[in-house]
Amino acid sequence: LSILFLTVLSHLGLLGKPFHVYSPSSKENTLWIVKATPKGESLKLEVAEKVKFDFSGRVITAHPRKPLLYVTATGGDPGKVPGAVVFLNKDGSYQKHQNINFNDGACYLSLDTGNRHILGVSYGNGRLNVYPLDEQGIPGKAITTIDEGKKEAHCVLLPPDGKNVYIPYVKGN
């Protein structure tokens, strides 16, 4: 499997090129931006920056076509769950971030196949929220909230055709 991974990376032209790893730290209320540089068969990791947030970010996803990251907390007051849109430079380094609010804390975020909406599911209450994205990729107020009466939603997945949404519920469901 690792040979296949290296083969794919070399065909994509990524082998040997530095890249960034992004990780929210809920304990420090920061976004860690780590520069990863391939060195032969190893990987050199160095903290490029720690971005301070006003909230405990736990969940992160990237926009597939824009240099944006979406970070959210897993809990908070309904309609005021803190999150942020992180703007990146072309090289993947940090530019700025904008605080936003979500309806519910999310344990998983996904974008629809047209990259026009971000979908979030809550582990705590099981709800799905769908937020429209404006031209810059900033989420607006939720246009749909679905509550099936089940808790512990694990993730929200969409097939390539985008015609369905799959939300597995865990534990007692």
Regions found by a protein language model. Give the residues of each.
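Bacterial N-terminal signal peptides
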Residues: S2-H11
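An edge-strand/N-cap motif at the start of beta-rich repeat modules
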Residues: G16-T37
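Residue-level detector of Asp-centered blade-edge/turn motifs that repeat once per structural unit
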Residues: K17, H63-K66, T113-N115, P160-D161
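Short glycine/acidic-enriched loop and turn motifs that connect beta-strands
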Residues: E28-N29, G75-G79, G124-R127, K171-N173
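Short loop/turn segments immediately following beta-strands, especially the blade-tip
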Residues: V34-S42, V86-G92, Y131-I138
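Asp-box/WD-like beta-propeller blade repeats and closely related beta-sheet repeat scaffolds
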Residues: K96-P159
